[in-house]
UniProtKB/Swiss-Prot annotation:
Tissues in which the protein is found: Confined to flowers.
Domain notes from UniProt: The Asp-Asp-Xaa-Xaa-Asp/Glu (DDXXD/E) motif is important for the catalytic activity, presumably through binding to Mg(2+).
Gene that specifies this protein: TER
UniProt binding sites for (2E)-geranyl diphosphate: R242, D279, D283, R414, N417
Record: residues binding Mg(2+) 1: D279, D283
Entry keyword set: Chloroplast, Lyase, Magnesium, Metal-binding, Plastid, Transit peptide
Biological-process GO terms, alphabetical: alpha-pinene biosynthetic process; circadian rhythm; diterpenoid biosynthetic process; green leaf volatile biosynthetic process; limonene biosynthetic process; terpenoid biosynthetic process
Species assigned in the record: Nicotiana langsdorffii (Langsdorff's tobacco)
Enzymatic class: lyase
GO MF, one annotated term: sabinene synthase activity
The protein's role, per its UniProt record: Monoterpene synthase (TPS) involved in the biosynthesis of monoterpene natural products of the 'cineole cassette', volatile compounds present in floral scent. Catalyzes the conversion of (2E)-geranyl diphosphate (GPP) into alpha-terpineol and, as minor products, sabinene, beta-myrcene, limonene, alpha-pinene and 1,8-cineole.
Name used for this protein in its record: Terpineol synthase, chloroplastic
Cofactor note: Binds 3 Mg(2+) or Mn(2+) ions per subunit.
Binding annotation for Mg(2+) 2: D279, D283
Length: 522
């Protein structure tokens, strides 16, 4: 038996159950609702200039409170789309372009014709053009990032610069806004916004209250899934596997933080925890014969295949079977959930066969399997049934065949995972990842391979943007947002290495800030 050499969890059951949050219950709701009504009046106030409205919407989004004002925001953006005249500044044009695209409005890259070349000294405009460029789709050459990135890097070398702009530039170059996890961005931006001279006290108070109230709801979700995880006994009986319940819950906040989706977060945390455990059965524990038997049992959903397996592998099977029966209150859903889990386990088995035979697949072979083995299809199939009401027959067809929205989200998750984890996994003796496959196939250095993977991520984001913009799919908006948020969460979790299995300090700090530390009142 191999060993994953994983560290124990940092957050045990007793710690999670002991967490107290002052913002639970209705204590602060009266003040919050008052602030919300005042904010609605401000958003819809007559006489505001177009740019002022766009800046307010941008701040609402970055502070994490725009979901309270969806109707008002769409009303303003619809009006801007219909009646807007070309802006004379690069900054205003780029902000308008990004916000309209984010909200599903068709807006052409031609809006920038003649602007970008004449505004190279407008650093704020260049920053907003850089951020807008990440909403590009394939073939939109006007929105290439290279020259704006070069300009922004040069700007940071200057001594006498606007420190607020410099912070935003540095953050954008580290990871663009479109790729960032929404709730972490809100946590950071609240601190940034608090120090701005144009800060609106009403909006700041609303954002802080909202963050803390939502955080309290998340903690209740976490306590629930911690009790479930303890009851499964998997952490104790699978000592070779990653015990990462809090990290698994952290993923679900990235996918959908909205307080009313607590049930979805609880179910998706269970999905993530079972995926992590079963992944480690294939990667670390099982022999090839055992893994073949386990896969056969999953494929047939028949316990006869389990007879010769170790008890802890049987335990995994029964935990998964119990979970599917718990979730699928509608019998029609069961085949779709089982198919997704079967596809996942079959992809794990392919990787196990490569490992035991010491085979290095071609890049194409690897990628054809790896976008499934990263588990995004399983996660998103469950997400659909948790969001869609009623279920759409056409959507079920696209779901079973993994629509491009699922496929591109999965591919970003896979590639980001490979960038963050491949070094550690090779030390453990894992199957080669995309980096090693590309190095072997193209005879290039590791850094060249990593650069190629980064390029693939950028190109895949363009495809995901395109899939998001296409109206001809039967999925609810919230499902499409969840797929995009899963890709964002991948960028977050693997930005500084293996944030899921490795428990690096950056991920620990992010989890603490998001789950366990409230923001003090302004």
């Amino acid at each position: 038996r191999r060993s994953g050499n994983y560290q124990p969890t940092m957050w045990d059951f007793e710690y999670i159950q002991s967490i107290h949050n002052d913002y639970a219950g209705d204590k602060y709701m009266k003040r919050f609702n008052e602030l919300k009504e005042e904010m609605k009046k401000m958003i819809m106030a007559e006489g505001s200039q177009e740019l002022e409205k766009l800046e307010l919407i941008d701040n609402l989004q970055r502070l994490g409170v725009s979901y309270h004002f969806k109707h008002e925001i769409m009303q303003i953006l619809s009006s801007i789309k219909q009646h807007s005249t070309p802006a004379d500044s690069l900054y205003a044009t780029a902000l308008k372009f990004r916000l309209l695209r984010e909200h599903g409005f068709h807006i052409s890259q031609e809006i920038f014709d003649g602007l970008s070349e004449t505004h190279t000294k407008d650093t704020k405009g260049m920053l907003y053009l850089y951020e807008a460029s990440f909403l590009a789709t394939e073939g939109e050459s006007e929105l290439e990032q290279a020259w704006t990135e070069k300009h922004l890097r040069e700007y940071l070398k200057n001594k006498n610069i606007d420190q607020n702009v410099a912070k935003l530039v540095h953050r954008a170059l580290e990871l663009p806004l479109h790729w960032r996890m929404l709730r972490l961005e809100a946590r950071w931006f609240i601190s940034f916004y608090k120090k701005r001279q144009d800060m609106i006290p009403l909006l700041l108070e609303l954002a802080i209250l909202d963050f803390n109230i939502v955080q309290a709801a998340h903690i209740q979700d976490l306590k629930y899934v911690a009790r479930w995880w303890k009851e499964t006994g998997l952490a104790e009986n699978l000592p070779f596997a990653r015990d990462r319940l809090v990290e698994n819950f952290f993923w679900t906040i990235g996918v959908n933080f909205l307080p009313q989706y607590g049930y979805s977060r609880r179910i998706e945390t269970k999905v993530n925890a079972l995926v992590t455990a079963i992944d480690d059965v294939y990667d670390v524990f099982g022999t090839l014969d055992e893994l073949q038997c386990f896969t056969d049992a999953i494929q047939r959903w028949n316990t006869d295949e389990l007879d010769n397996l170790p008890d802890n592998m049987k335990m995994c099977y029964f935990a998964l079977d119990d979970f599917i029966n718990e979730v699928a209150c509608d019998a029609l859903i069961v085949p779709y959930l089982r198919n997704a889990w079967t596809d996942l386990c079959k992809s794990y088995l392919i990787e196990a066969k490569w490992y035991f035979s010491k085979y290095i697949p071609t890049m194409e072979e690897y990628m054809d399997n790896a976008w499934i083995s990263i588990s995004a299809p399983v996660i998103l199939v469950h997400a659909y049934f948790l969001i869609a009401n009623p279920v759409n027959k056409e959507a079920l067809h696209y779901l079973r065949n993994y629509h491009d929205i699922i496929r591109w989200s999965a591919l970003i998750l896979r590639l980001a995972n490979d960038l963050g984890t491949s070094s550690d996994e090779l030390k453990r003796g894992d199957v080669p990842k995309s980096i090693q496959c590309y190095m072997n196939e193209k005879k290039v250095s590791e850094e060249e391979a990593r650069q190629h993977i980064r390029l693939l991520i950028s190109e895949t984001w363009k495809k995901l943007n395109e899939a998001h913009n296409v109206a001809a799919h039967p999925f609810p908006k919230m499902f499409v947002k969840s797929a995009m948020n899963l890709a964002r969460m991948a960028q977050c979790m693997y930005q500084h290495g293996d944030g899921h299995g490795g428990q690096n300090s950056e991920t620990q700090n992010r989890i603490m800030a998001l789950l366990f530390e409230s923001i003090p009142p302004a």
